[in-house]
Amino acid sequence: MFARNQSGSQGGAFYLASPGWRSHISDSYFVQNRATQGSSGYSDGVIFSLLSGNTIADNVSSRNGVYTQMGESEYMVSTFVNNTFVNNRLTAKSSSLSDKTNGGSAIYFKSGSGSLNLVNNTIVGNTDSCYTTSGVPSVNFNGSAVHVISGKVRLVNNIIAGNFSSAAAAGEVYLGESASLQNSTYNLYGGADRMNITAKSTDMVCRNYDRCVQDLQKVLDSEIVDGKLSLLLSDNGGFVPTVKVKSVACGNNNLNVLSAAALRESTFYIDINDNGVYTDNLAVDGRGVTRNTTGSMIGAYEYTGESGMEPNVQQNSIRVFVSEDNLYVISDSFTVGYTIYNLSGSLQMKGEAVSGRPVDVSILPAGVYMVETNDRSGGIEFTKVLKNN
């Protein structure tokens, strides 16, 4: 957890300026951090960065980007998968701004001809505001939740809606003159007048901001306060608090529209784990819950039924654990099939284990993994495991 950190400049929770480095931040909770820019995090020059399964909530920046990614290399790639950005604020002062490049109540990206990839994120209820000393909205401001000054952008399977901006024609997505939209598929956007990109054929667009807030309140665990959406975080399984999905129906749109193909790297052509191939798929949501490949939910949270009952990520009939460099599967069945994914949903290993006998997993780096097991009875279970070395 990164909580209540402060900086008078960049990087409230962390500051990373290491050209050529690679970073992977997963299953972390960034809450109530403050900074001028990058209150939850500021990264500059990292050649590849992956954020997966994080919750970034209630952070405040006073100029640019609650999460800020900077760089100049054309090879720079920043990929966000299964993250939740809610209730963050960018509160700029009109007198301190020189142009309309400021914004990013969720993400601020400026990277020459580098790439920003957003896949299955929930970016809702964030606020960009900038007023003059007389309390009038500044005309020198286009603040949006996703604010891209330069670079190539791919938006896939996200909820980017219900974000407020004091700017007249902003709120959800803003692309500067040096930014280009490469792809937009199966996203929910808050309104055509709230972004300067054109939604594509599979995207869904709310009628207007007020209607979007009302519709989203029925979909996500939240409340409406002074006309704005305030998201409610809770323990829904996984490592960090998340926003529970109550329904798949958002106005006239159903949000559980993703087929198995829509969750494959080869379909959206984003290498979500930077292993150099496009053969993996997004098997789990931000909590580690298996996605329904016949109708998966866009955003970071997989909807599993109106009853409110969520599947337990770890069941008891098959016991799975890691000790040193070995995986152990304990079951009443003699053999059990296993598949190991990282928390981005990328397949790492697959095979058959004999109950009680070690499986060598030394090729896997330290980290948290999701293990799918299936026995002869047809039962399938999922277990999160931690590999320490």
Description of each model-found segment:
Residues 157, 186, 266-268, 280, ...:
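Conserved beta-strand and immediately adjacent loop positions that scaffold enzyme active sites
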Residues 100-101, 293-295, 350, 383:
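Short capping micro-motif at the N-terminus of alpha-helices
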Residues 1-8, 14-254, 292:
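Predominantly extracellular beta-rich ligand-binding scaffolds that present long acidic/polar faces
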